[in-house]
From Swiss-Prot:
This protein's name: Lutropin subunit beta
Organism, as annotated: Felis catus (Cat)
Quaternary structure annotation from Swiss-Prot or TrEMBL: Heterodimer of a common alpha chain and a unique beta chain which confers biological specificity to thyrotropin, lutropin, follitropin and gonadotropin.
A cellular component annotation (GO) from this entry: extracellular space
Function: Promotes spermatogenesis and ovulation by stimulating the testes and ovaries to synthesize steroids.
Amino acid sequence: MEMLQGLLLLWLLLLNVGGVWTSREPLRPLCRPINATLAAENEACPVCVTFTTTICAGYCPSMMRVLPAALPPVPQPVCTYRELRFASVRLPGCPPGVDPVVSFPVALSCRCGPCRLSSSDCGGPRAQPLACDRPPLPGLLFL
């Protein structure tokens, strides 16, 4: 009986660390690069430009303590950049002296880890998607 309990415990541990879990289709999409449409604008320029880039999104395994009162909170991992590069779009119609170039990150690979406010928005889902205050301009002007 003890051997059976040991095997069951080993199987559950493997399932938890991903050995068995990742070999099958997960219930939720794991952290990975996905295409997303974003918007860029500048207060001094007359239009908003929408563009498609690759962002990190998806599920990261997390834990929650059952008895949280006496222990500090467990840091929750977020889906964030592992590798990225930067691309740019040019906002048309900007007056002289205003930089029309807006740079944005392009996710090359993603990972689950602590949120770095220097490169990620860790605020969670929004009630409304990020949108432009200015009229949108169809079409992309990549540099």
